[in-house]
A protein has these predicted regions:
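Active-site hotspot residues in diverse enzymes, especially metal/ion-binding acidic/histidine motifs
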Residues: 1-195
Length: 195
């Protein structure tokens, strides 16, 4: 039982920071862009003073972090990694210098070494224009309905929020809904659409 639990925990481990030796261990089976993000994430744990000090204490004892604190630390390390990866506002400035559209984050993902998904999210969240990005999981076939797709992530720019408010998007869509009709069956993404 204990070895199964340890194996399951290790299978979820993508990266690990050893503060004492100043080493970061990363699962090499991951995609190279994910490895870069994980390295930056683990660097965040070591660079943010309150996290570094807390983890240094925990390495010396058998105590663990409260789950809520651990979740907060993980979110902070993710933010740190994103800010470093996209060089604070540099990505946003570069995007503003390019033509408006889906090709811009695709091109910038190569320049910044990020995944396309991360670049699209950053583009939607930080663009000066009204932009929304809706990411759905691959649709599941539903007999009699056609399919159902679950919303994984919604990102909207401040300009979108100012114009339309904080939209509550449906958690699931099917072909008979307005959003469901836009799901790109057999393709990775739909074309950009004006509002």
């Amino acid at each position: 039982q204990a070895s199964d639990l340890a194996k399951r925990a290790l299978s979820k481990l993508l990266g690990l920071l050893h503060l004492g030796d100043r080493l970061i261990f990363v699962d090499r089976a991951l995609h190279e862009k994910k490895i870069l993000f994980i390295k930056l994430h683990e660097t965040g744990h070591g660079w943010l003073p309150h996290q570094r000090d807390t983890y240094a204490l925990l390495e010396e004892c058998e105590h663990t972090l409260d789950p809520d604190v651990r979740d907060a630390f993980e979110r902070e390390a993710n933010v740190f990694a994103g800010e470093v990866l996209f060089q604070l506002d540099r990505f946003t400035q570069d995007a503003a210098d390019c033509s408006f559209g889906v090709r811009t984050p695709l091109q910038l993902s190569k320049r910044y070494g990020s995944s396309v998904y991360a670049a699209m999210r950053r583009y939607a969240r930080t663009h000066a224009e009204a932009v929304v990005l809706l990411v759905f999981d691959p649709p599941d076939a539903i007999p009699g309905l056609g399919f159902e797709a679950t919303l994984r992530r919604a990102e909207q720019s401040d300009a979108f929020t100012a114009r339309f408010g904080r939209v509550t998007w449906p958690g699931k869509v099917s072909p008979d809904s307005q959003l469901g009709a836009l799901i790109p069956i057999g393709r990775r993404m739909s074309s950009p659409l004006p509002v």
